[in-house]
């Protein structure tokens, strides 16, 4: 990576500002999934071990007005982080002011403080989300000239707590998580070991147009599954019953199929039901057509067998988006079959691009078998599109 990393700077005795992604799900004051906290630990521990004084910034959810603050405080996160680190985490419960400044100035080497939810600054004029220059400058002034960005999940956004701080410090560097995310995803797309197979699921073609176009020029094959497959199949003249379809994207689907010249792989059969919820009949289709009154909710046995054929010998696999409604046991066989086909390839570098695919791998017990699971859905999508991430671009060059 052509940017400075946390290992390139002297940290001892310095107040080090760190942007982490602690945007975790919280229900009734309890964190229900702490993966993002765990993912930030290597960078935090390194800073503390080097004698740095860590000042952490993170957002949590969306905050538009005063009433939104309820349930959006980072207090439960401070408690969880303290337990994971085995040391106190100072939490002044504010985003600015004399109390915060005093608490930061009182930190000793190896101590840590968490600033309150950065999006509390969005209540008055969206200062965080719109990268208000004064806010970025103020937050930068709380440290000693070093900013570590370890929040890959927000790297595709230009906010005061990443791009704003970066612009006002001597050195803005990448943390270990950000460095790994970029290394795995960008290198897989830009310099893959071949054969390189990309797998795209999810419901809408419109969400993935840029990704499909970029990957068609980079990958050896692009497997399409999930709801967006039905738009491609309808564009080819197949019957799709009551399946999800974007009729306004049929011409685009035809264009992409022509451009792909055989690189786009679509389902050969489907698992269908007579309703999305409350269905009374589930069956497999004989081919790519779906009968009237039925909707496709997963791929079926011929497609799963084809996944094994298409992925045979693959050395790089990037997967973004499930191929069925995996949350329902009736429609998870396709996603399970796909994961089986990926992880059994010898020496394969297998990468999941965050979001629902990551949830599928974790919930269905496959997470440990993949080379890398991204922590950022939106950011990984933009990398797969070949876009420049503002949070990364703002870091200091090596």
From Swiss-Prot:
Catalyses which reaction(s): (2R)-3-phosphoglycerate + ATP = (2R)-3-phospho-glyceroyl phosphate + ADP
Molecular-function annotations in GO: ADP binding; ATP binding; phosphoglycerate kinase activity
GO biological process: gluconeogenesis; glycolytic process
EC number, as in UniProt: 2.7.2.3
Subcellular location: Cytoplasm
Pathway the protein acts in: Carbohydrate degradation; glycolysis; pyruvate from D-glyceraldehyde 3-phosphate: step 2/5
GO cellular component assignments: cytosol
Keywords: ATP-binding, Cytoplasm, Glycolysis, Kinase, Nucleotide-binding, Transferase
Complex and partners: Monomer.
Protein name, per record: Phosphoglycerate kinase
Organism of this sequence: Lactococcus lactis subsp. cremoris (strain SK11)
Lineage, uppermost ranks: Bacteria, Bacillati, Bacillota, Bacilli, Lactobacillales
Encoding gene (name): pgk
């Amino acid at each position: 990576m052509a940017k400075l990393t946390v290992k390139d700077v002297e940290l001892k005795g310095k107040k080090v500002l760190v942007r982490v992604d602690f945007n975790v799900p919280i229900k009734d004051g309890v964190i229900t999934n702490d993966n993002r906290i765990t993912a930030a630990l290597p960078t935090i521990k390194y800073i503390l071990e080097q004698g740095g004084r860590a000042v952490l910034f993170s957002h949590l959810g969306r905050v538009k007005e005063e009433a939104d603050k309820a349930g959006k405080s980072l207090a439960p996160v401070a408690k969880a982080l303290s337990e994971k680190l085995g040391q106190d985490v100072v939490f002044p419960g504010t985003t600015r002011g004399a109390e915060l400044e005093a608490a930061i100035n009182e930190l000793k080497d190896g101590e840590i403080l968490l600033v309150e939810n950065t999006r509390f600054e969005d209540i008055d004029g969206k200062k965080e989300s719109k990268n208000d220059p004064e806010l970025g400058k103020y937050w930068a002034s709380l440290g000693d000239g070093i900013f570590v960005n370890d929040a890959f999940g927000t790297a595709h956004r230009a906010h005061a707590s990443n791009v704003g701080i970066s612009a006002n410090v001597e050195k803005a560097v990448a943390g270990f998580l950000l460095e790994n995310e970029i290394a795995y995803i960008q290198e897989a797309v830009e310099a893959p070991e071949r054969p390189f197979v990309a797998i795209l699921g999810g419901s809408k073609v419109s969400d993935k147009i840029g990704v499909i176009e970029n990957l068609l020029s980079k990958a050896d094959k692009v497997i399409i599954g999930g709801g967006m497959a039905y738009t491609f199949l309808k564009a080819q003249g197949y019957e799709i019953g009551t399946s999800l379809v974007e009729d306004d994207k049929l011409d685009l689907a035809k264009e992409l199929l022509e451009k792909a010249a055989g690189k786009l792989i679509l389902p050969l059969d489907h698992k269908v039901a007579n309703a999305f919820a409350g269905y009374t009949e589930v069956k497999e289709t004989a081919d790519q057509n779906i009968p009237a009154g039925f909707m496709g909710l997963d791929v079926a046995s011929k497609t799963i067998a084809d996944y094994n054929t298409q992925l045979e010998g693959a050395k790089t696999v990037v997967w973004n988006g499930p191929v069925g409604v995996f949350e329902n046991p009736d429609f998870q066989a396709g996603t399970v079959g796909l994961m089986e086909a990926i992880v059994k390839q010898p020496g394969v570098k297998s990468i999941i691009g965050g979001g629902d695919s990551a949830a599928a791998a974790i919930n269905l017990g496959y997470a440990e078998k993949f080379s890398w699971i991204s922590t950022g859905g939106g950011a990984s999508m933009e990398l797969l599109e070949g876009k420049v991430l503002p949070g990364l671009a703002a870091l200091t060059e090596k």
